[in-house]
Structure formats: C-alpha cells, structure tokens
Curated annotation (Swiss-Prot):
GO terms for biological process: calcium-dependent activation of synaptic vesicle fusion; regulation of calcium ion-dependent exocytosis; regulation of synaptic vesicle exocytosis; vesicle-mediated transport. The gene is SYT13. GO terms for cellular component: axon; dense core granule; exocytic vesicle; intracellular membrane-bounded organelle; plasma membrane; synaptic vesicle membrane; transport vesicle. Residues 158-275, 287-422 form the C2 domain. The first C2 domain/C2A does not mediate Ca(2+)-dependent phospholipid binding. The second C2 domain/C2B domain binds phospholipids regardless of whether calcium is present. This is Synaptotagmin-13. It comes from Homo sapiens.
C-alpha cells in the first residue's frame, strides 16, 4: 500500500511530460509545413500592406501645393450695374460739338488697397455721357413761335356751321337727318362733340343724338338721326339740331343750335345744305351751379349707388345770406311718378364749392331700373333753421341731355362708377 503511492505519482509526471513533448512536436511540424499561416498581420511584410487599398485611404497619391495670395473680401450684397440714359443726339449743335464728356466735381482719391487685376467690376469705367453741355456752360431757352395767320385767326371768331340732309319715309312715318358734318373753331380742342336732334309738334317732342366724336375743325358723323313723326304733323313741326360738346369732366355745353321748319318751303327734303349755328339762350353760363356725382348699379345685389362728390358755383337769390351755412343734398328714388325712398347727405359748409364725398345706397330690383329715376335737390339752411332749395336736377331716361346720357351709360356699364357734372336748375 505504501509502495503504490510513489508509483502513481511517477506515472502522472511521466504522462504530463510526454503530453508536453507531443504538443511541442506537433507545433513544430505545423510551422514547418505552413510557415506563414500562423503570423499575425503586424508581422507580415510592410510593403504588402502599402500595396493593398483600404477603406480609409486611397491607393492614389495626391500632390498638395501651398501658395499665399491676397484674398479680397466679397460683399454679401451685390449691386446691379447702373447705366445712364443715352441722350438723343439729334440737334446740329450737339452733332457738331467735338468734345463733350461727363466730368465729376469730386477729386479722385487714392485707393486704400491695390485692386486685383481680374476685378472688372471695380475697374469698370463709365463710357456713356449722361448730360450734354454747351461749350460756354450756358443753357439758352428755346422758344417755338407760330407764324401769325390772319385767316386762321379770323376762323376762331366764326360761328360753327352744320351740314345736314333731311329725308322722310312715308311708310315708316320717320324723319331722317343724314350727312352730318360740323365745322367749328379749334380753340376748344380736346373736347368731344355730338349732334342732338329734337322734333317738337302739338303732341310733344322726340329726341335723338349721335355718338361722341373727337372735336376737330371738320367733324363728320357716319350715322344719322331717326325721329318718328306722323306725316300730317310735318307742316307744323319744328326740327332743332344742336351741336353739343363734352369735356374730360363729362360737362356738356351747347356750341350752337339750328331751328328748321318742316313745312317743305324753307328746307326742301332730300337736299343737302349748310346751316349756321346760333348760340342757344336756354342754358345760361352760370345758372344755379353744378354738381358732380357718380352712379352705378350692382345687378347681383340689386343696389343702386349714388355718390355725391361736390358742387361748384352755387348761385341763388339768397346766396349771400346762406354763405357759411350748412348745405346738403336730398336724393329721391322714383319709379315713374311714384316716390320709393329718399335720403339726405350730411351737411357741409356753404362756401360756394361744398364737398360731401358721401355714398347713398338704394335697394332697387333689376326689372324696375329702366323706368326709375333719381332726383337731386341741393338744400341750404338759413338763420331761422328753414331749408331752402338752391337747385335741383333729375337723372333718368325721361330726361334729356347729360342727365339722360348719364343714366344710359350706367345701364350699359353695370358695376362701374360713372361720374359726370350736371347743371342745377332753379
């Protein structure tokens, strides 16, 4: 029993040593058969590592050269190129002028820093001349005068003339006024003109007018006037042809009128002739004053808008007493002879030319618009507080002149404000 313990220990020691020697032999044999397989990556050839590309570096080699050049700061805001206007060189004085240039009154200053040679914007030079000055530096006034023409000056004082031709259709019972031409003076240039014709008989009167034409020395209308008239009323009827003008403020005035009898003796039918127009005495130059207003109609809302803007040259017997008092305008909406509604503007101080700038709105169906009208009455307040009329006017198809044309323009142009001046009547 005592002998067996040392034997066991000796066997274990020999077995361990044999195992270690066998392991070392196997390791040496593996290294001999595969000499490079067991090397770590860091033990491999460093040249091979340089030849292999990696994810972090590229196999190509770059050459970086460093140079020092001045860097110019770039402005955040770039201003566009500004060019001066090119003068129209047409005068012979300018064409024959040998030396002219744009001179600056400021002395040139030295640049703070040298500019780069490629900066064309900073080195750009202005080559266009903005102004052309004479050699002596004095600009002379140029005055263009027209040669005096006695014949042309005499035509300014001549009365306007109207060319016309009368025809009558017995089957239709209509009177035709054709070949309308007007010869007027040129001192009222810039206005429009039209011809208005009216026939008065025992039963009443009918009117018709042409379209607006630019007023010239010789104005011609391609259209004519058609006036209904019974044949038995020809001997007693009177035809009035009126030449009217309209300025840019839509103010209508009478340039002249011509009265003709239709009995067939004074004016033969079918013959064209000239007639001298006479100034009408029906419309005074001042009257009771004028009022400026605009009207418009909104079909979708069935609303009639009347804007009272201002008045001027208000005249009446009590004008001096009412000067400085309150003045207002009463607007009445009528359908035929029935008054539908009336409204009044605010009061303004009577200074001959009062200003309101106030809008009045009426509810009016579309089917009642044709037979409706608007009446305006300018009212002044005296010392006792009583209101007195300074003038009135009416707009509608039942009226004539500018009052009728204003209403017709409103019907033709819905949703559009149309302003006109109208004469006030006492």
């Amino acid at each position: 029993m005592v002998l067996s313990v040392p034997v066991i220990a000796l066997g274990a020691t020999l077995g361990t040593a044999t195992s270690i020697l066998a392991l070392c032999g196997v390791t040496c044999l593996c290294r001999h058969m595969h000499p490079k397989k067991g090397l770590l990556p860091r033990d491999q050839d460093p040249d091979l590592e340089k030849a292999k590309p990696s994810l972090l570096g590229s196999a190509q080699q770059f050459n970086v050269k460093k140079s020092t050049e001045p860097v110019q700061p770039r402005a955040l805001l770039k201003f566009p190129d500004i060019y001066g206007p090119r003068p129209a060189v047409t005068a012979p004085e300018v064409i024959n002028y040998a030396d002219y240039s744009l001179r600056s009154t400021e002395e040139p200053t030295a640049p703070a820093s040298p500019q780069p040679p490629n900066d064309s914007r900073l080195k750009r030079q202005v080559t266009e001349e903005l102004f052309i000055l004479p050699q002596n530096g004095v600009v002379e006034d140029v005055c263009v005068m027209e040669t005096w023409n006695p014949e042309k000056a005499a035509s300014w004082n001549q009365a306007p003339k109207l060319h016309y031709c009368l025809d009558y259709d017995c089957q239709k019972a209509e009177l035709f006024v054709t070949r309308l031409e007007a010869v007027t003076s040129n001192h009222d240039g810039g206005c429009d003109c039209y011809v208005q014709g009216s026939v008065a008989n025992r039963t009443g009167s009918v009117e018709a007018q042409t379209a607006l034409k630019k007023r010239q020395l010789h104005t011609t209308w391609e259209e004519g006037l058609v006036l209904p008239l019974a044949e038995e009323e020809l001997p007693t009827a009177t035809l009035t042809l009126t030449l009217r003008t309209c300025d840019r403020f839509s103010r209508h005035s009478v340039a002249g009128e011509l009265r003709l009898g239709l009995d067939g003796t004074s004016v033969p039918l079918g013959a064209a002739q000239w007639g001298e127009l006479k100034t009408s005495a029906k419309e005074p130059s001042a009257g009771a004053g004028e009022v400026l207003l605009s009207i418009s109609y909104l079909p979708a809302a069935n609303r009639l808008l009347v804007v009272l803007i201002k008045a001027k040259n208000l005249h009446s017997n009590q004008s001096k007493e009412l000067l400085g008092k309150d003045v207002s305008v009463k607007v009445t909406l009528k359908h035929q002879a029935r008054k539908l509604k009336k409204k009044q503007t605010k009061r303004a101080k009577h200074k001959i030319n009062p200003v309101w700038n106030e809008m009045i709105m009426f509810e009016l169906p579309d089917d009642l618009l044709q037979a409706s009208s608007v009446e305006l009455e300018v009212l002044g307040q005296d010392d006792s507080g009583q209101s007195c009329a300074l003038g009135h006017c009416s707009l509608g198809l039942h009226t004539s002149g500018s009052e009728r044309s204003h209403w017709e323009e409103m019907l033709k142009n819905p949703r559009r404000q149309i302003a006109m001046w109208h004469q006030l009547h006492l």
